């Protein structure tokens, strides 16, 4: 199985499913109660209480990840991005790149709405600025087309260049 990071894992719903499919899952969330629930529902995965701003340090990654210490896939679901403090948004996106192995992918999904003001266009621009490729964008987990300016949900498939 792949080495997968569940960024903003909450109570471990996504990580549990990925672990059940045979992947090596590490979940990170800022809320210790949610991490305790994740440990309860999926004790064989690794669950860490931490802020995504501190992601590389918490995972023991200095500089950019290598094939030995990085993740092949990062999943960030559940509106995590929409609730980040404005000052931490781009650093968190950069951390996503830093923890991916060369050629690794990130799948990030979140919605717009009250209290969630990280504009999709800004998120995609931030991803490009920190060195991630934007490979695909969708307006749902069912892969409906993303329409800039009218979609209320974004699922972005990003990748760290292989070299």
Question: Can you say where each PLM-predicted feature lies in the sequence?
Answer:
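Conserved class I S-adenosyl-L-methionine
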Residues: 2-10
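Class I SAM-dependent methyltransferase SAM/SAH-binding core
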Residues: 11-56
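A short acidic, Gly/Pro-enriched loop at the edge of an enzyme's catalytic core
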Residues: 58-73
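A short SAM/SAH-binding and catalytic strip from SAM-dependent methyltransferases
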Residues: 72-87
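Conserved beta-strand signature within the Rossmann-like core of class I S-adenosyl-L-methionine
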Residues: 103-110
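Short alpha-helix
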Residues: 116-131
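Class I S-adenosyl-L-methionine
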Residues: 132-162
């Amino acid at each position: 199985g792949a080495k997968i990071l569940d960024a903003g894992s909450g109570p471990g719903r996504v990580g549990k499913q990925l672990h059940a499919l045979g992947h090596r899952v590490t979940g990170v969330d800022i809320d210790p109660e949610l991490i305790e629930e994740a440990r309860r529902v999926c004790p064989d995965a690794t669950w860490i209480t931490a802020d995504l701003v501190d992601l590389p340090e918490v995972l023991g990654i200095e500089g950019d990840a290598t094939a030995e210490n990085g993740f092949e896939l990062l999943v960030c679901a559940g509106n995590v991005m929409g609730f980040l403090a404005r000052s931490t948004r781009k650093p968190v996106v950069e951390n996503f790149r830093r923890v991916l192995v060369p050629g690794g992918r990130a799948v990030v999904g979140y919605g717009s709405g009250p209290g969630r003001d990280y504009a999709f266009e800004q998120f995609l621009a931030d991803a490009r600025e920190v060195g991630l490729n934007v490979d695909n964008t969708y307006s749902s987990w069912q892969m409906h087309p993303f329409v800039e300016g009218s979609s209320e949900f974004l699922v972005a498939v990003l990748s760290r260049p292989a070299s």
